[in-house]
Amino acid sequence: MGRELDVPVAIAPATPDLARVASRVAIPVLAQHVDPVDAGPRTGFVPPEAIRASGVWGSLVNHSEHPLPPTEVRSAVERLHALELVAVVCAGDVDVARKLAATRPAYLAVEPPELIGGKRAVSTARPEVVSGAVAAVREVSPGTRVLCGAGVHDRTDVRKALELGASGVLVASAVTLAADPRAAIEELLTGFV
C-alpha cells in the first residue's frame, strides 16, 4: 500500500515473528525492542546480533512499554550502528527527546505515554510536544528524523504531525485494534499525500 502512494512504511512484528516476516515482505522490518547485551548466556534478553540474524532493518529502542535507562539507550544505539542497523529511539517528552537525540539515531519518535493507545493524537492534543521535539532534535542531531506517535489514528492526525515538522508517524493500536487493519493503514497513508 505504501509503495502505491510512494510513502515509506516499516513494520515491527513480535520478536518470534521477525525472521518469518522479514523473509516474506519487501518493506523494512523493525524489532520492537533490543537489549544492549552481548550474545551468550542472556536468558530473556534480545541482543542486537539476534535481531540482525533475523534479517531486520533495525529496532525500536526505549518504547514506553519497554523503557531503558539512558545509558542503556546509548549502548543499544551504538550496538545497532555497529551492526549497520537502524535505531528508532522513543521519547515521552521534549526533554527526553533532546537528551536521547545525542545518541544520533536515524529516527526519534516522540510519544507521551499517557496518549499511547488512546483516542486523542499527540499532534492535536499536545502539538507543542511534537513541534518542541522537532526543534530540540534538529538542534542536537540534525540528521535524525522525528516521528510522531501516541494516539495517531487517521489522515488528519498524520497531516497535523507533518505540519508540526515530523517526518512521519509511529502507530500500533490504530492498526492492530482496527476492525479492518488494511483500511486503517490506507487511511493513515492518505495523510501523507
Feature map (PLM): residue ranges:
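Hydrophobic faces of well-ordered beta-strands that scaffold small-molecule active sites
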Residues: 9-13, 29-32, 59-61, 87-89, ...
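Glycine/small-residue-rich loop that forms an oxyanion/phosphate-binding "nest" at active or ligand-binding sites
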Residues: 26-82
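Glycine-rich beta-to-alpha transition loops that act as phosphate-gripper elements at the mouths
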Residues: 33-36, 40-43, 69-71, 90-95, ...
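Glycine/Thr-rich beta-alpha phosphate-binding loop at enzyme active sites
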Residues: 35-38, 43-44, 109-134, 144, ...
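C-terminal helical cap(s) of enzyme catalytic domains, especially alpha/beta-barrels
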Residues: 76-82, 122-128, 162, 173-193
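Catalytic cores of alpha/beta
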Residues: 91-104, 141, 148-169
